[in-house]
Amino acid sequence: MAPLLFLPILQLLLLYCTKSAQAQLNISIGSSLTPQGINNSWISPTADFAFGFLAVDGNSSSYLLAVWFNKIADKTVIWYAKTSSNRQDDTIPIQVQAGSILKLADGALSLRDPSGNEVWNPRVTDVGYARMLDTGNFRLLGTDGATKWESFGDPSDTILPTQVLPLGTALHSRLLATDYSNGRFQLNVQDDGNLVLYLVAVPSAYYHDPYWASNTVGNGSQLVFNETGRIYFTLTNGSQINITSAGVDSMGDFFHRATLDTDGVFRQYIYPKSKQARSLWQEQWRAVDALPENICQTIQTKVGSGACGFNSYCTFDGTKNTTNCLCPQRYKFFDNERTYKGCRPDFEPQSCDLDETAAMVQYEMTPIDRINWPLSDYEQYSPIDETECRRLCVIDCFCSVAVFNKPSNTCYKKKLPLSNGNMDSSLQATVLLKVPRSTNSPSMISSGSSKWKKDKKYWILGSSLFFGSSVLVNFLLIFVLLFGTYCSITSRKKTQLSQLPSNSGLPSKIFTYRELEKATGGFHEVLGTGASGIVYKGQLQDECGTNIAVKKIEKLQQEAQKEFLVEVQTIGQTFHRNLVRLLGFCNEGTEKLLVYEFMSNGSLNTFLFNDSHPHWSLRVQVALGVSRGLFYLHEECNKQIIHCDMKPQNILLDDNFVAKISDFGLAKLLPVNQTQTNTGIRGTRGYVAPEWFKNIGITSKVDVYSFGVILLELVCCRKNVELEVADEEQTILTYWANDCYRCGRIDLLVASDDEAIFNIKKVERFVAVALWCLQEEPSMRPTMHKVMQMLDGAVQIPTPPDPSSYISSLA
């Protein structure tokens, strides 16, 4: 009887508990969360998922507002709050400190920092309550139960079963596993009905060509991860395209997720959930399918670095379904944690001033196993053998890798930066990497030692004979020297004048070698070096003590000896404010020297590339001056002069920072292999026009191309190629500038330059002109006359075509 009396009481208790549990499903108005303490998250009914504050990488000073798998030890994040940045199609993860608060009040959800400033809200009102569902979806609902906002509708990098991505939504990979910023890859359900995987430039967010697409333009509808674990793309006609094809594991036994990972692969994962599954499976996430199957082979982009960073290569482990980025030997990562930034050589780049013998002594080609950079070729030879292939790369300062294909006897040369690198087991070729030789090579030491022993006895004998006879010979030498000096001084200048084709247009002064040797103090103070020789500072013994710059022409090709004075005559006929003036010359036997006016402010290279930015107005003045100087050389001289080696080192600045072009008119005097290539290339790495690498005629447009590079350097106050920059996408200025221009983010190029930001319209105009100059097709580039007009603002500048293809032409 007594138990019957307790039955009504038991029923009441059960009813109370049921209603109490039901009430916990709803998160009511007035509820709040804080990063620290026990009240830091709202849990789903089964406790599978949680919404709230999660410490970033175990760091108790920084917290994400996120949704995560609550029963998994590492608290795998599946959603995190973001806010829009000022960059196109970019968002920034919300990270807050202790003292912040998330509160559901006044019909809205709001996150405020310790100072009370709102840092995030989902931008909905009239919220009646919230729910953390067992599907992993966090919802805000109205008092009528209608969904106002849900985390499934604002995905991050992951989707879960029952989640649907409609047209116009996207998944963004993280930059790193512990860096929740937008990464280098996107999965877009485009408005046009196409499902596309993109490689995205960082930080400009410029979209490169897709590396995978469903090809369903006009037919696609939505991406579905259904409740059974299948992922498919539905079409408007009701049919489906399977995105993953893995066998579906029980939803009751396993947690499921699909994530666009940091390496650009969209993977479906499972994790043992039930006791039975945990007894059979290791408690960790296991990838059961992936798209694309092998991203190392899939991404082959004309612009950008590929799956990994520049100068690195991608490897794929099919058994673990993982990728890895590695550096070739003698290269190292810019940042060991952020390997996407690529690799750089751990040795000094080869100088283009080395002759063939020096290059062969200092560098060698070493084989590397099955690694290929398929889109970095700039030269091809066939038929050829491997030995010659090696030699041609070693003596070419542009060449970093050679690939020899034995079946076809073909050699391909590649240059930095290397892109789209991957480990290719099917590659039927020998890949050779150029590296410095070891300076203490045993073979070199032993050969040198044996040679010394062999020649030692002959050296002693020869020295004895020489010194024994020197007393007698010295008397004769003194007499001959005095007499010869007298004759030489009286006839030297007459000899030089007799060699001239015509005296008209020559510089006003003809110097003897002795005069210039004395003026330069024995060629003591070096001002600079270039392809044509070394420049020394000197001072004339005139009333004013005029400072001069003396260039000693070196490595003059034999057939050009007679052309020297003709070229001096041509240069002597040039008179322009923006050209360095030739004061005189010396032509004594093999000694060829040019005497120029001295430029007190040195080269543009020194002026531009230092810790402080030169004033914007001075940079504009230099750009306009250089353009006028080139226009004069190309179109106003009696005989057109193509410079062929335009670079900041060949632009000098006078007392008033007026830009003056130097080294013009010397191009055809130099040996065609001066840059150590067999293609007749002249110029300097980073400034060379694409046509130098092709068997086509060279025109004045090669100077226009080089000017485009210089113009970007003037705008940004940095070199075209900088291997030490923090972001890999900024390594090559011409690529980065093109990305920024296409995205409408020119301000990124001059972010730390207040003067340039104030003149952002002119900056944009200069960048547009530069991109016109950088067109791969020479006929597409403007003349220097047109360039002058565009820089001055005298004509409208149409939008330049995207010069993406010039990746194959830059060094």
Curated annotation (Swiss-Prot):
Residues 24-153 form the Bulb-type lectin domain. It catalyses: L-seryl-[protein] + ATP = O-phospho-L-seryl-[protein] + ADP + H(+); L-threonyl-[protein] + ATP = O-phospho-L-threonyl-[protein] + ADP + H(+). The active site is at D645. ATP binds at L527, G528, T529, G530, A531, S532, G533, I534, V535, K551. InterPro entries: Bulb-type_lectin_dom, Bulb-type_lectin_dom_sf, G-type_lectin_kinases/EP1-like, Kinase-like_dom_sf, Prot_kinase_dom, Protein_kinase_ATP_BS, Ser/Thr_kinase_AS, SRK-like_kinase. SMART domains: B_lectin, S_TKc. Residues 24-464 are extracellular. Disulfide bonds join C296-C314, C308-C325, C327-C343, C389-C411, C393-C399. It is a single-pass type I membrane protein. It holds the Pfam family Pkinase. Glycans are attached at N26, N39, N59, N219, N226, N237, N242, N321. Residues 1-23 form the signal peptide. CDD domains: PAN_AP_plant. Residues 352-436 form the PAN domain. GO terms for biological process: defense response; response to other organism. Keywords: ATP-binding, Disulfide bond, EGF-like domain, Glycoprotein, Kinase, Lectin, Membrane, Nucleotide-binding, Plant defense, Receptor, Serine/threonine-protein kinase, Signal, Transferase, Transmembrane, Transmembrane helix. GO terms for molecular function: ATP binding; carbohydrate binding; protein kinase activity; protein serine kinase activity; protein serine/threonine kinase activity. Residues 521-795 form the Protein kinase domain. Its EC number is 2.7.11.1. Involved in resistance against the herbivorous insect brown planthopper (N.lugens, BPH). Member of the BPH3 (BPH resistance locus 3) cluster which contains LECRK1, LECRK2 and LECRK3. This is G-type lectin S-receptor-like serine/threonine-protein kinase LECRK2. The gene is LECRK2.
